[in-house]
A protein has these predicted regions:
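DUTPase catalytic domain/fold
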Residues: 1-154
Length: 154
């Protein structure tokens, strides 16, 4: 069962779903909550290694370069580029609440994928959601910290 906006607000009031900062009314849909893009990105620098070795988790960190986008400036996602980002909001789920992250259709229609595979947030999860951003399109796209980037259902 997916919670309605009324149920989501009730669960927030009860503390079963905790989101900070508090959300303005326009971020609530009929059965979802919109989260905004944060200012922190991790850019993959593929030229540092011949391949990614999944058995070497430290090696993955070694090929990423953190970038913080200044307020009011865009992060330009190039065609076929893949980066990691985080949401502006911090989410905490009770031990009996599951969250699902979905990209916004307005972004999907221009080729922006918000998550590749990791859309499930287990009960008890806490933190800022990591976004797996990819531009499948043929043109660069300017993404602005603070813009609505994804929706959560519970």
């Amino acid at each position: 069962m997916v919670l309605s906006d009324v149920d989501i607000k009730r669960y927030i009031e009860k503390g079963k779903i905790r989101i900070s900062p508090d959300l303005p009314p326009e971020q609530f849909g009929s059965c979802s909550v919109d989260f905004r893009l944060g200012a922190e990105f991790n850019i993959f620098e593929y030229s540092r290694h011949a391949y990614i070795d999944l058995r070497d988790r430290g090696g993955i960190q070694d090929i990423m370069r953190p970038v913080t986008v200044p307020a009011g400036e865009p992060f330009v996602l190039q065609p076929h580029e893949f980066v990691l980002a985080i949401t502006e909001e911090h989410l905490e789920l009770d031990d009996d609440i599951l969250g699902r992250l979905e990209g916004r259709s307005s972004l999907g229609r221009i080729g922006i994928i918000v998550h590749g595979t990791a859309g499930l947030f287990d009960p008890g999860w806490r933190g800022k959601a990591t976004l797996e951003l990819s531009n499948l399109g043929r043109m660069p796209v300017a993404l602005y910290p603070g813009m609505r980037i994804c929706s959560f259902t519970f």
